[in-house]
Curated annotation (Swiss-Prot):
Its EC number is 3.4.21.88. One of its GO terms (molecular function) is DNA binding. Belongs to the peptidase S24 family. This is LexA repressor. It comes from Methylobacterium nodulans (strain LMG 21967 / CNCM I-2342 / ORS 2060). It catalyses: Hydrolysis of Ala-|-Gly bond in repressor LexA. Pfam families: LexA_DNA_bind, Peptidase_S24. Homodimer. InterPro entries: LexA, LexA-like, LexA/Signal_pep-like_sf, LexA_DNA-bd_dom, LexA_repressor, Peptidase_S24_LexA, Peptidase_S24_S26A/B/C, WH-like_DNA-bd_sf.
Length: 240
C-alpha cells in the first residue's frame, strides 16, 4: 500500500515524463509536493523503488524509470492532484495542525477484569519508517489489568530494529494514544507527517532522537517540527 504522498510523486513523475520525455528534477519534485527539502523526495523515491514502482539507473542524470503504475495513480483527467500531508491513524488530518479523529474506544471492560477489545489499526515499522495502514483491520482481546486509562490501539510490528527491547517482527504492540512522551519511552513517531516508526524517544537539547534497539540501525536526530508523537507503548502481544 502506497501513501498518498508516494502516489502523488509517482503521478507527477509519470505525467512529466509523458509531457517532456524526461523525469523531473529533485527540485521540481520538491516544489510539486510542497516539501521543504529534497531529503523528503529521496525518501519517497527510495520507498517507491523498494515497492517496485520505480527504478533508478546508475551514472545517468535524472535516471528514474517508472516500472509499474497502480490504478490510483492515473486520474481520469490526467491532471496532477495535489493533497495535504496524510499520516497514520491517530494523527491523520486534512491539515497538519488539525486534531486527529477519535479512534474506536476499547469495549467490554468491567470491574471484574473481563477482557476488552483493542482495535488493530495496521502495521508499524521497527526498522526503516514505513506507512501504517489507517483503517481498523480487526480487534484483539486484552485483560484490562495490562492497560491504564485512555484510548488504546494495536499495531503489527514489521522489522527488527527494536529486538534488544524485546520487540520482534510480527509482534502486536499496544499503544496508548497520546501526543507527548518522556525521554526513554518507546513511541509511535510520525516523521514529516508521512512515515511512522516505532522507536525509543530521546531528547537532545531542542532536537528529538529516535533510537533503535539494534546496533545495525542508526539513531535519527530530527527537529521537533518534523516529529509528532502518536502514542506510547504500554504492552506487547506475541503468538507462538
Amino acid at each position: 500500500m502506497l501513501t498518498r504522498k508516494q502516489l502523488d510523486l509517482l503521478r507527477f513523475i509519470q505525467q512529466r515524463m509523458r509531457e517532456t520525455g524526461v523525469p523531473p528534477s529533485f527540485d521540481e519534485m520538491k516544489d510539486a509536493l510542497d516539501l521543504k527539502s529534497k531529503s523528503g523526495i529521496h525518501r519517497l523515491i527510495t520507498a517507491l523503488e523498494e515497492r517496485g514502482f520505480l527504478r533508478r539507473l546508475p551514472n545517468r542524470a535524472r535516471a528514474i524509470e517508472v516500472i509499474r503504475i497502480p490504478d490510483a495513480v492515473v486520474p481520469p483527467s490526467g491532471e496532477v492532484v495535489r493533497f495535504t500531508p496524510s499520516v497514520v491513524e491517530g494523527g491523520r488530518t486534512a491539515a497538519p495542525a488539525a486534531k486527529a479523529a477519535p479512534m474506536p474506544s476499547s469495549l467490554g471492560s468491567d470491574d471484574n477484569g473481563r477482557s476488552i477489545s483493542i482495535p488493530v489499526m495496521g502495521r508499524i515499522a521497527a526498522g526503516t519508517p514505513i506507512s501504517a495502514i489507517q483503517s481498523q483491520s480487526r480487534t484483539v482481546a486484552m485483560s484490562p489489568d495490562f492497560l491504564a486509562g485512555g484510548e488504546h490501539y494495536a499495531l503489527e510490528v514489521r522489522g527488527d530494529s527494536m529486538i534488544e527491547a524485546g520487540i520482534l517482527d510480527g509482534d502486536l504492540v499496544v499503544i496508548r494514544r497520546q501526543d507527548t512522551a518522556n525521554t526513554g519511552d518507546i513511541v509511535v513517531a510520525l516523521i514529516d507527517d508521512e512515515e511512522a516508526t516505532l522507536k525509543r524517544l530521546r531528547r537532545r537539547g531542542s532536537s528529538i532522537a529516535l533510537e533503535a534497539a539494534n546496533p545495525a540501525y542508526e539513531t535519527r536526530v530530527l527537529g521537533p517540527d518534523r516529529v509528532r508523537i502518536q502514542g506510547r507503548l504500554v504492552s506487547l502481544i506475541r503468538k507462538y
